[in-house]
A protein has these predicted regions:
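A solvent-exposed, charged loop/short amphipathic helix patch at secondary-structure junctions
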Residues: 43-62
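Well-ordered, non-membrane alpha-helical segments in soluble/globular domains
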Residues: 14-18, 57-70
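His/Asp/Glu-enriched short active-site or ligand-binding loop at hydrolase and phosphoryl-transfer sites
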Residues: 108-116
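Loop/turn elements at helix/coil->beta-strand transitions in domains of secreted/extracellular proteins
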Residues: 27-32, 78-83, 106-109
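Active-site segments of SGNH/GDSL-like serine hydrolases
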Residues: 35-42, 48, 66-101
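Conserved SGNH/GDSL esterase-like catalytic core that processes O-acyl groups on lipids
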Residues: 1-48
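Histidine-centered active-site loop/cap adjacent to the catalytic His
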Residues: 119-140
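Acidic-and-aromatic substrate-binding clefts and catalytic sites of carbohydrate-active enzymes
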Residues: 7-13, 87-95, 118-122
């Protein structure tokens, strides 16, 4: 999950994107690809509201404020990296729309994936190939 809320309301603060994001910029990447929101949607994590500053620890338990926190970090720390946010198909509308709005606010490229083959809401092997094809076409 992007946020600290996982399946069945479990605390995922030890493995959420907001915890792991600090490891991504260690190697000065040319491109950062974020594929987030799938588990937040399927786990019924709280969606929350877009929040562009003043985050609290309780905000990190909702998807959209956590997404904004993460995008703020990446755009501030990885200024020379191309950042692309992949949004899975078939997510809750409020998550898709919120992440899209957050990307627009932070100037992050956003790819809305289409017709991805899935198993239990996650891309199958065929779906991963479809994602690769869509991302390759997007960054050309």
């Amino acid at each position: 999950t992007i946020c600290n809320t996982g399946y069945d309301g479990a605390d995922y603060s030890d493995r959420a994107f907001t915890k792991r994001m600090f490891n991504v910029t260690a190697g000065d990447p040319d491109m950062i690809v974020i594929f987030g929101g799938t588990n937040d949607s399927w786990a019924n994590a709280p969606v929350g509201e877009l929040k562009f500053n003043g985050w609290t620890s309780s905000d990190m338990y909702s998807c959209l404020p956590s997404c904004c926190f993460m995008l703020e970090y990446f755009t501030a720390v990885a200024k020379d990296s191309q950042i692309v946010f992949l949004i899975n198909s078939e997510l809750k509308d409020e998550i898709t729309e919120g992440i899209t709005a957050a990307c627009r606010h932070y100037g992050v490229q956003c790819l809305l994936l289409k017709d991805i083959d899935k198993i239990w809401g996650h891309p199958s092997i065929k779906g991963m190939a479809q994602i690769s094809d869509q991302l390759t076409e997007f960054i050309k």
